[in-house]
Amino acid sequence: MELLVQQLVNGLAVGSIYALIALGYTMVYGTIKLINFAHGDVYMMGAFIGYFAVMVLKMNVFVALLVAMVVCAVLGIVIERVAYKPLRKSTRVAALITAIGVSYLLENAMSYFFGAESRPFPSDFGTETFTLFGDVSVNGKQILIFGVTVALMALLQFIVRYTKMGKAMRAVAVDEQAAQLMGIDVDGVISFTFALGSALAGIAGVLVGVYYNTISTTMGITVGLKAFVAAVLGGIGSIPGAMVGGYLIGLLETMVSFFGYSPYRDGVVYFLLFIILIVLPAGLFGKNVREKV
């Protein structure tokens, strides 16, 4: 029983990472109905920015988190302005293909400059372990992940619900043209949404580096897809849904490994996506919306 509880703790730590990345997917889709498949590579960029901050600039983990957050936010704005804004009036297929192209560009550019091999993430943070009860324990890295994730989720909910920019984001999500007629800077809102989602992905990248002590230029592919599954599971476009979906995927992966089927954990996640699209296409918190074509 205690071993099972320990796996649940581990699953919540992994799920926190998926939740942070899934929030970026769901915010962008909720605002402009775009699946930003380059988002996983922004997460990878965040990990390498954190690596540079810790290894070269000799910063501590907390400062590295802030640096990754700011740089990835700027990167998100650049990607939106250069790659997506010119295609805003184009078909969704064109935007989707562009997103895949941006993903390949970031991944291959990083592989060219830094190589495709894994790099050890230098962090001595969180080596201490705290016993909860019996043989169930939590380490400093997991506490960092839980603390940062909960704080960011609370901050995000506050921004979306109670700030002027958050209200503008919700208005653009409902009707972009009506929001523009009401005087809302739609371009600014969309850029802010990309910046916010990219900042969360950058922080997730640093947290993964701290947790697993290794990063690579291809790390964004699988994790990005799983975070997308989490967003779909929770109901893409729903912020609470992305949070719940991330934790559910993390727990599912951990339980699959716990029962001895670790080689199949990725397949189980993708099979879950298949089932969701058939049984519950709107996700757990999504709404079925009819569109006229």
What feature does the model see in each segment?
Residues M1-I21, I49, V61-A64, S90-A94, ...:
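Membrane-interfacial amphipathic/re-entrant helices at transmembrane-helix boundaries
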Residues V9, T31-V78, V82, L87, ...:
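Membrane-embedded helix boundary and interhelical linker motif in transport proteins
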Residues V14, V136-I215, I239, V244-G245:
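Helix-loop-helix "hairpin" substructures at the membrane interface of multi-pass membrane proteins
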Residues Y18, K58-V70, S191-A201, G205-F271:
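Transmembrane alpha-helical segments in multi-pass inner-membrane proteins
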Residues A47-F52, A68-L75, V102-N108, F146-Q157, ...:
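Hydrophobic core segments of alpha-helical transmembrane domains in multi-pass membrane transport
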Residues K58-V102, A109, V244-I249, L280-P281:
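Alpha-helical transmembrane segments within multi-pass membrane transporters and channels
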Residues V82, F113, V174-G188, G260-V293:
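Cytosolic-side transmembrane-helix boundaries in multi-pass membrane proteins
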Residues L87, R92-Y162, V189, M255, ...:
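Transmembrane helix-bundle core of multi-pass membrane transporters
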